[in-house]
Amino acid sequence: FCGYLLAQEGYCPLIIERGAPVRERQKDVERFWKTGVLDPDSNVQFGEGGAGTFSDGKLNTLVKDAKGRNRFVLETFVKFGAPEDILWEQKPHIGTDILIDVVEAMRNKITELGGEIHFHSMVTDIIPEEESVVVNGCEKIRTSAAVLAIGHSAKDTVQMLFDRGVDMSGKSFAVGVRVEHPQSLIDRNAYGREERGSLPAAAYKLTEKLDNGRGVYTFCMCPGGYVVNASSEPERLAVNGMSYHGRAGENANSAVIVT
């Protein structure tokens, strides 16, 4: 969105993406799911569209925005191919299958307006005194302004910034697991019967405050979805939940988080 807005205002942004274009990335992800062969720079976390492309496409936010930016995001997604129902649904959802098309369409618009996107390119250093960034350890690019949209799991980039003396602070986090159960079980509890007809796959959100002050709650519930391997490092495991637009999978899943 940053690149898109800059291009809309007449700038020619250069977007540096460590991963692959979304179509190539889709093939890398599918190969990983089938064979276990991981590309550390093109996977569920890294590549065009970021981690969100393969993370269900839910568009929920608890941030109140009087300036209308949340609405702008939804309208922009529709402009580039997302279903119009995200404009009025209480819990708008695009789905990974449609997000791939939306991401590609946004990229094409950015380049049409004069922007550039360099794939398989990673910022490996910043040199503030020279107003430069270093790409892939060798190419130096001068710029008066750089936006670091680090995203999810780029701990090597965070380490580089720390080594460069960038101020940063720790952030609290929650720990949990992802659970999976038949979608028919959730439908039966929500609708009173397993056959839901034309009703959508049912969802849920649960929370509990314990006597010891700890909390437990469900998060990122995926009706009719899938639990997927979301690893981005060799010999490391990360799991995530996702669903396609139709939410037609046999199972539902959700993260269960403790604080």
Range-by-range predicted roles:
Residues 1-259:
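Residues forming the flavin
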